[in-house]
Amino acid sequence: MRRDIVVNQQFTSKVKSIGINSHGAILSSANEPKKLPNKKLVSTKSHTQVNREKSKNKDTYEDYSDSNNSHITYGLPNYFVKKNRLSVDNDMVESNNNEFDYISDD
């Protein structure tokens, strides 16, 4: 019985309060002087976010989308090519407003 009391006294004198923050880490405020954090244990999360930049050579949606939104490309500039002249298929006739009208077989 006496041993339990001693252990409890040592524990309560060292730690004032224990709490859990929003990230699930256990926090404790102790009477001991604060130690400097070990450099190996410091999180590098902020450093990785700072270094995340768009690659200059990478194709993006904004690089190839034109202001009229007539064609949209997703990093494939050579695949989507705007043609200057319109090709007329056998089943279609070109109208004056540069759109295709289907011929109906009535």
Swiss-Prot record:
Positions of region (Disordered):
28-68
Amino acid composition bias (Basic and acidic residues), ranges on this chain? 50-61
Q: Which domain of life is it from?
A: Viruses
Q: What name is this protein filed under?
A: Uncharacterized protein R860
Organism name: Acanthamoeba polyphaga mimivirus
